[in-house]
Regions:
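Short, surface-exposed recognition loops or helix-turn segments adjacent to catalytic cores
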Residues: 4-5, 55
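Active-site core of glycosidic bond-cleaving carbohydrate-active enzymes
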Residues: 12-364, 371-373, 382, 391-397
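C-terminal accessory/binding modules appended to enzymatic or scaffolding proteins
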Residues: 376-378
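C-terminal beta-strand-rich structural cap/linker in extracellular carbohydrate-active enzymes
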Residues: 381, 390-395, 400-416
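Short edge beta-strand/loop segments characteristic of extracellular beta-sandwich folds
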Residues: 384-386
Length: 416
């Protein structure tokens, strides 16, 4: 199993592991654990919700649930679809995915928004309010519905795919209530039909990856996410001021019992930053919105974690453990988004290369695939590919069949 760190978190968490899995699929030639962990954690309760951690005392006692963790788990199943196209495994896992998305469907209001969810709605260790209907939960559920529909259709089940897309369309209509037209952003929560002013990077990113924000809004949402002048480090663990990097603010879930403290920051102007774990969603949203050239500089935020411990990434920007697997998103991003190499699930043995060099002049890496390792180098105006096996490579309008041991150049590709 994937565990988050060698100290207190030696548990098989259901949601955290999505980052660990993506690191494995991106950098490791042995995908056995990346394949196994989603199966290990596919142990739904009688109501369809997954335990927040499995194979231990948390699952045994069923002390609580983290609803959003099940949605990250769905994404890990979709990762298996994209990287392995393993029909047998996906056929076994898809009924569990269906039960997860159905669990949220059963807890929606008249507008199709999940509302007042039970358990611990964690999001991450940032101060993201989750009362009533929550933008981040809605966006993650939207992503899960789209992923379930895609995998169902791929397996030949058009009926379930249509069902999921109908739910998604209803959700997208209801999600409009979370749009603040005066500030041109999504707020975190809708309580008793009223938008509360708090907002976050999480809300904007989830709206994009969940397919809930109209495309014409995406550039504005990227601005909200990336505007350093308005971003704030805020955590419920510290109710009276910022939880900046280096403050060693203690983590704490006391708010689960006493409720969220009222915001101390300027909720009309400031946007709560995502912690390292949720940044994988933020970065996916930025790339999906066509702003991937920003990513190389955004990854420099991890310098704060290296200042705290030069050998590993810590749990949050402000404290917690000094070694936490869920904070390792840059390792994935440098391959998937900056180098831009990802598999084509619909054409086994093929790679899609969509680089985002940003401020870098070049990037080069050995990338594991289901058939073997491929070396890719990206420079301004040129992509070079070399493999020990035959592979089809596509980049924009350029494509090539790379033969074993032969270096192939894709010169016409425009690199941004």
């Amino acid at each position: 199993a994937y565990v988050d760190c060698p100290t207190r978190e030696q548990r098989a968490w259901t949601g955290d592991s999505v980052v660990h899995q993506m690191i494995d699929l991106t950098t490791n030639t042995d995908w056995s654990l990346a394949r196994w962990h989603p199966q290990l954690t596919a142990t739904p309760r009688s109501d369809g919700m997954l335990p927040m951690a499995v194979a231990g005392e948390i699952e045994h006692t069923d002390i609580s649930i983290i609803p959003d963790w099940a949605l990250h788990w769905v994404h890990s199943v979709h990762n298996l679809f994209r990287y392995t196209a393993d029909r047998e495994t996906l056929t076994r896992l898809l009924p569990v995915v269906e039960r997860v998305v159905q669990w949220f469907a059963e807890r929606t209001d008249e507008h199709g928004l999940p509302v007042d969810l039970p358990g611990w709605v964690l999001i991450d260790w940032s101060a993201v309010h989750s009362d009533g209907a929550n933008s981040t939960i809605a966006g993650l559920w939207g992503r899960s519905l789209l992923e379930f529909a895609e995998m169902s259709e791929w397996l030949g089940d058009g009926g379930r795919a249509a069902w999921a897309r109908q739910l998604h369309a209803r959700l997208a209509d209801g999600f409009e209530q979370l749009w603040d037209p005066e500030r041109s952003l999504y707020v975190d929560t809708l309580v008793d039909g009223r938008r509360r002013p708090m907002t976050s990077q999480h809300a904007q990113a989830a709206a994009i990856v969940g397919g809930l924000a109209p495309r014409e809004r995406w550039p504005r949402l990227v601005e909200v996410i990336c505007d350093e002048t308005n971003l704030v480090h805020a955590a419920f663990a510290r109710a009276d001021g910022p939880s900046d990097p280096g403050t060693e603010t203690e983590l704490g879930g006391v708010y689960m019992y006493i409720g969220h403290p009222e915001p101390w920051w300027d909720t009309e102007r400031q946007v709560v930053r995502a912690q390292p774990f949720f940044r994988y969603v933020v970065h996916d949203a930025i790339v999906l919105a066509g702003a991937g050239s920003r990513l190389s500089r955004l990854l420099l935020d991890w310098r704060a974690l290296l200042d705290r411990c030069s050998a590993s990434f810590g749990e949050t920007w402000y404290g917690g453990t000094t070694c936490h697997g869920w904070s390792s998103t840059p390792t994935r991003d440098l391959i998937q988004h900056v180098l831009g190499v990802q598999p084509d699930a619909y054409e086994p043995g093929s790679l899609v290369i969509a680089p985002n060099l940003g401020h870098l002049d070049w990037i080069e890496a050995d990338v594991p695939t289901i058939d073997g390792v491929v070396r890719v180098r990206v420079e301004r105006g040129r992509i070079t590919v070399r493999a020990d096996h035959q592979v089809h490579v596509r980049s924009g309008s350029d494509s090539a069949h790379v033969m074993p041991g032969v270096t192939t150049v894709l010169p016409r590709t425009i690199i941004t």
